[in-house]
Amino acid sequence: MGEPIYRRVVVKLSGEYFAGPQHYGIDQPTIDRVAGDLIAARGLGVEIAVVVGGGNIFRGVEVSARGVSRPTGDTMGMLATVMNCLALGEALRRHGQPARTFSALLMPEVCDLYTRAAAQQTLAEGGIALLAGGTGNPFFTTDTTAVLRAAEIDAGAVLKATNVDGVYTADPKRDPNAKRFERLTHSEALAGGYKVMDATAFALARETSLPIIVFSIAEPGSIGAVLGGAGRATVVAG
C-alpha cells in the first residue's frame, strides 16, 4: 500500500450497512468493524469526516409514499442519521479514537451544531468528525450531503462505501455480464444514470471538481486500501 492519495476525505457510509445481518437497526459488531477501519485509515495520517445514512432505521422516501409528507419523512430520516453517528462515535472513542458528532439540526443536548469551522478544527486536532442530520433540509440525500460537506471542508475526495467494488454497467449481483468501470467522468456518471449515487450528488461533485471513489466496504481494511491506491474501486472525476 502506497502513501495516501488524499490528506482529507469524507467517507460516506450506508445506514443499511450498519444493520449487519439483521437488516434493521444497529449491529454492534458491524459498527465496531467500521470503527476499526476508520481508525486504521486515520493512522495513515488522513483527516476523516464521515457522513452516514439512516436507512437501517428509517427511510423518509418510503413513508412519504404511505401518507407522511415528504418534508416530515425526510426530517425523521435525518434524525436516524444522528442515531447512527452517535453509535459510531461511541465505538470510535471506545477504541481510543477521538470523535465528535455534528448535526445540521439543532439539538444541543445530544450533539454539536455543524459549522464548517468546528468540523475543520476537529479534523486538525486528530479527531474524526461525524456529520449527521443530512443537509438539514428535506429533499436532499445523504449522498448529496457528503459531497456538500466535502466541498465545504476542503476535502480532497468523497469515498463512497457500497456493497460492490465500484460502478458497473448493471447490477453485478443480477447481471453476470455487468462490467466494472475503472474511471468515469462526472458527466458520464450523470448520463449513464448509475444508481450508486443520486444525480444531485454527481452534479455538485462536477461543479466543485470533487472526485468520488466508489468501493466496497465489505472487506476489512478497504478504506485504507482505497486511500493508498491499492483497493478495487471506480474513480469518478473530471
Swiss-Prot record:
Record's function text: Catalyzes the reversible phosphorylation of UMP to UDP.
InterPro entries the UniProt entry points to: AceGlu_kinase-like_sf (IPR036393), Asp/Glu/Uridylate_kinase (IPR001048), Uridylate_kinase (IPR011817), Uridylate_kinase_bac (IPR015963)
Source organism (scientific name): Rhodopseudomonas palustris (strain HaA2)
Residues annotated to bind UMP: 54, 74, 135-142
Enzyme Commission number, as recorded: 2.7.4.22
GO biological process annotation, one example: UDP biosynthetic process
Pathway the protein acts in: Pyrimidine metabolism; CTP biosynthesis via de novo pathway; UDP from UMP (UMPK route): step 1/1
Subunit comment: Homohexamer.
Family: Belongs to the UMP kinase family.
GO cellular component: cytosol
Name of the molecule in the record: Uridylate kinase
Domain of life the protein comes from: Bacteria
Pfam families referenced in this protein's UniProt entry, alphabetically: AA_kinase
Subcellular localization: Cytoplasm
Regulation of this protein's activity per its record: Inhibited by UTP.
Alphabetical UniProt keywords: ATP-binding, Cytoplasm, Kinase, Nucleotide-binding, Pyrimidine biosynthesis, Transferase
Any one GO MF annotation of this record: ATP binding
Reactions catalysed according to its record: UMP + ATP = UDP + ADP
Gene3D superfamilies, per the entry: Acetylglutamate kinase-like
Principal subcellular localization: cytoplasm
Chain sites annotated for binding ATP: 12-15, 55, 59, 162-163, 168, 171
